[in-house]
Amino acid sequence: MSGLKLFYFILFGQSISLLGSSLTGFALGVWVYQTSESVMEFTLILVASTLPGIVLGPFIGSWVDRLNRKSLLVGAQAGSALIIMGLAFLYYYDLLRFWHIAVIVSLGSVFATMLQVGFTSTVTLMVPTEDLNKANAALGMVLGLVQLAGPFLAGKALDTIGISTILLIDIVSFSFGLGTLLLASLPSTPAKPADTQTSVWEEVKEAYRFLKSKPGVLGGLYLFTLIWFNVSAVQALITPLVLSYASPSEAGLIMSVAGVGALLGGAVMMGWKGPERRMYGILGAALAIAFILVLLPVYSSLVWIGFWAFVIMALAPVATVCSQTLWQRKVPVHFHGRAFSLRNTIIKAAQPAAFLSAGFLYQSVFEPLMKEGALLANIFGPIWGIGEGRGIALLISLFGILSIVIVLMAWSIRAIRTADTALPDENISRAAT
């Protein structure tokens, strides 16, 4: 088994595992929010679930380039399963506390980063260059399916079987991901051109120097980091926004509707393969999503939010597939682990700051000032409304406006706008066909 068949086989196992993780992630977030009634604690858990992977990402990438990919992926999958087992044990014996969750999801973040970087950098070893678009679109469809089924099932499960059974389902789901990895025969990583032994830190710096040598790439990364800051802030706020006037199962339904959009967008990208100009696809989709973020929270309507969530997630695969394919074609395969993890670290470094600032701005500034008779309510109330959840709504719209400005800045810089055509493709078509 090789090429796309091998990729699809491994992707099948990972999709089952991702579905289990999606159930746990959504259910755990709702459980923390409902038991603490604190947006700040909710956002702190989000920070704990991302920060360790971000900080250690470049070093993980270096090890991905050094180690046997199959052994690394199997180890990361097994480690993730053990983390969920520990969480289930604490919950079953009524020992689970906030700080337990923070520590456990922090460890889970490290294993998740190993899986993400390891799998992403292995795609170009399995799949021929001409099929990268199809593989990346298939990955987007899987993520859409997971987002479609996970939150909806988790919302229903919280109302019926409870979080303990959800954790058990997650543990079982890991066996599928682990099983396919054990059965698969992954291609070996090509040797580095220079036959020299360097430290992990030197390899991280080497990856940064490589990105810096690509005109427009590093500047684009920094600007996209600002966009990711805004998107992450909205991510932290959207669940409390919906829960301010809806039940957990209804919130799960909204996420599932968004998943349908991601599924549709991924299907379109598999058939269309995206625009010829990758950067136009990235920037165009980002600009459209930014405009939608301004409109999405204006009305307290599940239909309204569900519709725009669907559109956002239908557009997202255009940007993600174009971006992933661009990097896979422009970066030499022996750099993939370090380059991809460094890219993720630079972009996602804004995520914890976004989570914390969103929680603080909501609880301390926007929510109090959007109550009846307060300063912001008098100014913005006629459009965004007044009362519970309206502070979140206004804040999301402001993040959308900021995103529009950032995308337009990126579009105006020639080096960023032409990064897809100005840089030569690297010879990465190593996969067996």
Where are these regions (language model features)?
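Helix-loop-helix hairpin linking two adjacent transmembrane segments in secondary transporters
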Residues: 93-96, 143-180
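Helix-loop junctions on the cytosolic side of multi-pass membrane transporters
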Residues: 94, 121, 125, 167-198, ...
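Helix-loop boundary and gating motifs at the non-cytosolic
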Residues: 1-54, 209-258, 347
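Short hydrophobic/alpha-helical segments at membrane-entry points of transmembrane helices
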Residues: 9-10, 96-104, 219-220, 303-309
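Cytoplasmic helix-loop-helix junction between adjacent transmembrane helices
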Residues: 104-147, 151
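C-terminal transmembrane bundle of multi-pass solute transporters/carriers
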Residues: 45, 55-59, 66, 70-72, ...
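Intracellular juxtamembrane helix-capping segments at the cytosolic ends
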Residues: 28, 114-127, 319-331
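Loop-to-transmembrane helix entry/capping segments in MFS-fold secondary transporters
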Residues: 39-40, 129-139, 248, 333-343
